[in-house]
Each structure stands twice: as structure tokens, then as C-alpha cells.
Amino acid sequence: MVKMMEKKNYCKEIQDYIDYASNNPNKISEDIKLCIENIVKPTLSRDDIIFDEKVFQDCIKFCEKWFYPLFPYQKFIYAFFFMYEKETPSLVIFSEILILMGRGNGKDGMLMPLCCFLLTHYYGIKNYNIDIVATSEEQAINTFNVVYNMLDENKTVMKKYFEWNKTEIRNKKTNSKLRYNTSNAKTKDGKQTGMILFNEYHAYEDYKQINVYSSGLGKIEHARTVIITTNGTVREGPLDEKISISESVLRGEDNFLNLLPFLYRLKKREDVDKAFAKFLETKDKKDINLDILCQANPSLEYREVLKNEIIKDYLKMQQQKSYRTEFYAKRVNLPEQDEDEVAIEWNKILKASFKNVEEKIPRDFNVKDGEDAIVGIDFADLNDFASVGLLFKIENEIIWRHHTWICCKSRFYKDIKFPFANIGLDGFNDFEVVNTESINARDIVLYVLKYIGKYNIKKIVLDSYRYKLLEQTFKEFNVSVETRDNPNGLIRMVRYPASIAAIVAPQLEVEFSNGNINIGDSALMRWSINNTGVKTGRDGNKAYYKIEPKLRKNDPFMAFVVAMSVINLLVKEVIYV
């Protein structure tokens, strides 16, 4: 039972951190500032919540006695675990808590003392089972061992209250258990769980495992999900989606999911360089000012080891370019891709989708009926993926909108790393999943034909192999092929597809960099571009390739590429009189 304190809207530890943030703005990320203004302060002013200050203080004492002193920001975060609905105290105010911070900040060390406390009679919920979920066994065990090692080191006292082995810790009074789980999610459905702790959420490429564990919530009071993670290199996965939702909540939009996001991260690459700018001139480590890196690393000013590691990694990055992706993603939560591999950098892909990236405001589709257009078509096999797109050029803006068919009978479908289950949601409206042995070639052709009357289609571009599979249907509708004898034929077959990238890749690099590409809010298109690598041959020509051949598809992007090969047909001739 929750025992109420008279001061339900005040917590010293929360106020201390708010004051710290106010006095040290350079050390606080913009996201944390928004969290304080748009979530924390409004929550503290509500009269429909209970803040159980006594149990919270008991938690702090327990954790600091049996584990180690907590940093101020950790106490600040802990406090929100002890807020409940006034009318229904079995429900927590924040049923989902996301904590994003850089590597080395002690994520496990922060949350595991709290998890241990939640097992005890001080918290008072019987059978409050906590499941640690990680994609690797090593990660799951390391997290679990924070509590296991404490119990083992204090076994004389702790054996009165706990029993434990290498896979499970049980509190004798409450029967609450701490367990760890790995990627074999098939056997975990139906667990009665009070809290799920997802560790290193960035490693998940889809929701298959996540959904299995989440289904165990709702049977025990105070049900909650906690995500603690650095950023990573997986794009358009669950973490990107969670961060996007968090950004909306932080801006003050409706918080239907009762989500509390603590996003410790940097927003700009140049902020990292600011910390080291003077040092790079003087070579004197005293000239390194890491204050701004505290935005992604809240433990930085308390842990000298972390400071030294960040400095070492930054210097390593200066000498080893390939380390840039790892440093920016893991140390400051600023995703960056290996520039020697990806065709287009992620931040440029986002700018192609959104006119305001932070607020996720999609780019407009200002194309009138009758506008000149190019059709691009690409697919590997009709029993897999197939994409068709329309390319427009309005002044300097290159606009691309696609439609993609996905065959769910493909032997690779279940393992493809894209959240098809989101179909119909914003950003997931330009594809369809077909439940047939293969994609119907007629559907592809009919899709093209319906736009021939709407727009002035200058060319339909695809390579000769793809054309052979669509030829019969195109002929049925009298769509002719461009030849030497028929230069006005609508279909242009590309004889040597590999040669296209040599022409298109340099142009796309410039157009993406200049912000001239408009793909709209298309998660599948962003994913497709991000799945495409580019290599420079000995002759200096560039060639595109799939970064992962079977499971990371790039058909929508390659349809765009073939259409771009004839974009000159969209250049309007200006006649001066």
C-alpha cells in the first residue's frame, strides 16, 4: 500500500537537479531542459498524483548503503518511479521511462540498485518480477551481476532476505524475482512481469522480441517498461521510433503513452569539436573543456575515468577516421554512419523527408496535375520486393514518391529488418504487403498506367531484365519501348545498370547536401537509402551496393536512381523573346 506524504508535489532531489540545470545550462541537453519545463514541472503541479516520498527516501538510503553513492541526476530520475495515480495507486504516472546516455556513464550501475530495492518489502509489491532483456547474453549477465555481486559480497546479511543463483534472484518476503533474458524470445511469452528493463535498445532492428516480453505486463500493479541505452547505427528501428515519439512529448504534445524520456545527447557534431578546439592548437590537455559533453554524459563531472576515456576516444578518432561512427553514436548519442560505406549520410536523408527535422514536419508535395514526370521501376525478384516511383523537378527541388510491394511469402520476409506492422501509420503509407506467392507484374504496370493520364510521363525507366518480366502487360496496354527507330517510345531500357551509379551518384551527393531532394515522410524510403552503400572503383567511378544483401532491401532507392538517370528530360526549356 502506498503511504502518502503531505507534500505530494515537492521533492528535494528533483528541485536540486532543476536548480543545477538552471545554473549550468551548458551542461544540460536541450532535451533535458524541455523535459523539465514540459513534463517535470507540470507533473509536480498536478493534484491528481501521489508522490511516495517516504519510500523514495528509503530507496535512496538502501541503494547508497548496499551499493554506492548516487549522483544528483540519478536521484532525480529515481524520484519518478514513486509517482502514482491518486484515484488508482496501482497505476504509475510514467509507465514507460526512456534513458538515453553515452557509453561509460554507468547505466547498469544506476538502475540495478533501484531494481534490487523494488524487489524488497520496503517497496511492498508482492511478486513484482523484473525482467532484464538484452540482445546478447553477455550484456544481460553483466547487468544482472550488479545485484548478484552485491548480494554475494554481503551474503551474511543478505541471505536472510534473498536467495540467489546465477540466473535468478528472489526476495524471500515478497517473492519478487530479478531475472535476465536474451534473444530467444519464443519461450518467454506469458511471463507475469512487474517491470521490464530493456538494455541497449539500439541493438533491436524490429519489435519481434520486444513485443514478446511486453505482453507479460499488466498482471502486476505498478507495471512499467524501462529502456536504458546508448544510440547505435541501426536506423528506422525501434529506438529511432521511440526517440521520435519522445521528441513530440518533449515539445509538449499529448503524452498518451505516459512516457518519460531522459535524452542525454548532443545535437550538433561541432559541439564535440568545441570542447577540444583550444587543445588542438596548444596540445595541452588543460585546455580541454568537456562541459558541453556533459549533455550526453551526465556522469562526466563525477567520474575521472570516463573523462579520460572520452579524451582518448576523441584523439583516436582524429587518427582513425573509421572510428568516427562509433564515437559519435556511443559517446555523445549523435548517430553518424561510416562515410566510406553509406551512399547518403543519415542527417541528409532526414532533411529529404522533413522540412523541420526536429519537429518531424514532412516536406510538401507541391506537384500539379499535368506536371512532367519520370517513372522509375526496380525489383530483384517478384517474390520479394518491387518498387515504382514518380520523379518530378519543380525549380530546384527534386521530388520523389514511390509505392512498394512486399511479398510476405518470401523466405526472407520474417527476418527483414523493417517494421512492416506499422503499415498505415504516418510515414508508413507507401507500401503494401501481398499474401501471394509473388508480386503480380500486372499490378506494377497498372500502377504506372494510372499516372499516365494524371501527369505528363516523359519516360518509364527500368533495366532490360526487369522489363522482360513486365513486357507482356506493357504490350497489352500499347506502351511502346524507346528504340533507334522509335525514339519517342515511353519505356527506356537500361542495358548496363551498373553504369548508372557512375553518373547518378555524384549528382545525388550534391543534391542531398544542398537539401534539394524531397522524398516526403517515407520510413521505407529512408530505410532503403540507408541500406545502400557506395564504393569508388580504381577508375574513380562510384557503384551502389546493398550493405546487407538479403535482409536490408534497397529497391525503392534503386528505382529512384534509375529515374534520376534521365532527369535531364525534366529540365524545362526557357525561350527568351
Regions found by a protein language model. Give the residues of each.
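Phosphate/NTP-binding elements of NTP-utilizing enzymes
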Residues: 2-377, 531
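Short polybasic/polar patches that bind polyanions
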Residues: 64, 475, 513
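RNase H-like, metal-dependent nuclease domains and their acidic two-metal-ion catalytic environment used
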Residues: 112, 141, 149-150, 170-174, ...
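Active-site phosphate-binding and catalytic loops of NTP-dependent enzymes
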Residues: 154-158, 515, 571, 575
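Extracytoplasmic
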Residues: 508-517
